[in-house]
Structure formats: structure tokens, C-alpha cells
Amino acid sequence: QNARIAVVYFAGY
């Protein structure tokens, strides 16, 4: 469920 947010968070890291 938080996979999409995790990807965006990681990409913005």
C-alpha cells in the first residue's frame, strides 16, 4: 500500500 509512496520518497532522496 505504501509502495508507491516509498518509491517517491526514495526517488526524492
From Swiss-Prot:
Q: Does the keyword RNA-binding apply?
A: no
Q: How is the cofactor bound?
A: Binds 1 FMN per monomer.
Task: Give the induction note.
Answer: By phenol.
The UniProt keyword set, sorted, is: Flavoprotein, FMN
Instruction: Identify the cofactor(s).
Output: FMN
Q: Does the keyword Flavoprotein apply?
A: yes
Q: Which cysteines are joined by disulfide bonds?
A: none
Tell me its family.
Belongs to the WrbA family.
Report the protein name in the record: Flavoprotein WrbA 1
Whose protein is this, by species?
Answer: Acinetobacter calcoaceticus
